[in-house]
Amino acid sequence: ISGINVQTGADCALGLHNYSPIQGQQEPMDINQSVRFALTEYQGYTPRKWDNGKDAEEYEEFREHLPEMIKHAVEGLKDFFDGVNRIEGESMKYHDEPLLDVPIMLYQDYSGGGKQIDLKCSLPMRNPPKKDGTRTWRVPKPKTEPTAQQVMQQAVYWKATGEKPALLFVTSAGYNIVDENNCELMTEDNL
């Protein structure tokens, strides 16, 4: 749910909340209003109770990191789409592959200007409890290499849309854009 809330906040800041291909990009909210909107949605989640408080503990910790993650996601998206007139938000699309009996359904996170990017969020990870019972958390750095599954996903998106793929890795420590310019796995030969 936290990754969804990061995307919600970024969508609001870019005018892509409630996106539809017919309406397109709307008037954006300012970043603080976008963060408040995403946090309000986040607070609608009720942590599960059957896991000895693990989900509730993560819920509280993740809430503290969401504002920075949203801000980094917006910075990364603005960086990636610099000079692009119109950005499209997430919507359901279909791709007909002649070798398959059914169409492939895909949800591109963001696209425009002949390129597309998929948002990937990494949340803080819990450290073991200290002797006094308290816990600290480790904030990961944004990833620099995609997983095999992420490369396969981007290959399908590229084949379906013809738009050059990229990945936006976001943590509360920053963001990293991975594309064909800085990662061999994202080049045409590997996709």
Model-identified regions with their sequence ranges:
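Generic recognition of stable, solvent-exposed alpha-helical segments in well-folded globular domains
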Residues: 5, 149-152, 189
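Secondary-structure boundary elements
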Residues: 80-83, 112-116, 160-166
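Non-catalytic protein-protein interaction segments used by genome-maintenance enzymes to assemble
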Residues: 93-153
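Metal-dependent nuclease catalytic regions and adjoining charged, substrate-binding loops involved
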Residues: 89, 100, 146, 156-191
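Ser/Thr- (and often Asn-) enriched beta-sheet segments in non-cytosolic proteins
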Residues: 36, 136, 164-166
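Short loop/turn segments at secondary-structure transitions that flank enzyme active sites
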Residues: 16, 20, 123-125, 171-174
